[in-house]
Amino acid sequence: MAALTRQRAGESGVPTELHQKYYSQRATAGLVVTEGTFPAWTNRAFPGQAGIATDEQAEGWRAVADRVHEEGGTLFMQIMHGGRTSHPDLIDGANPEAPSAFDWGGTVRGFAGKMDAPVSRELKKEELPRIVCLLYTSDAADE
C-alpha cells in the first residue's frame, strides 16, 4: 500500500487508535507504507501530521506497528521533512528550513487555517548532516 499523509494526529502528532485501525485494516496488502511522518518538530509540514519526534509519538507508532503485525502485515515508516510546505504556525514560530530561501507564492495550512507560504530559511551546507541523520535514523525522539 502506498504512502499518504492523512493529518489525523491532532496538534500532539501522536498516532491514535484511528491510526491503529486504519493501518491494521490494510495489513493484508503486505507492505504498508505509513503517512509522511515528521522526525523533528521543526520538520512538521501539516496540521494533524503524525510525528516520531517524541517518546509519546514513538509509543503511538509502536501500537500501530503491533496491530499491523498481528494482522500479518509489515509496516514501513515514511519519514518526511516538511521543508517549504511548513509554516511558523506549525513549528513554534520558527521559519521553515528548506534547500533555498525561495518565495514560491503558494499557500500552506497551519493550525490557524490556510495562509500564505513564508519564505523559508535556506539550509547551510554544514546543516545537511543533521537533516540526513534525522531522515536516515528517525532517532528523532532524542532531539
Role assignments for model-derived ranges:
Residues 136-142:
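Conserved small/polar residues in nucleotide/adenosyl-binding loops
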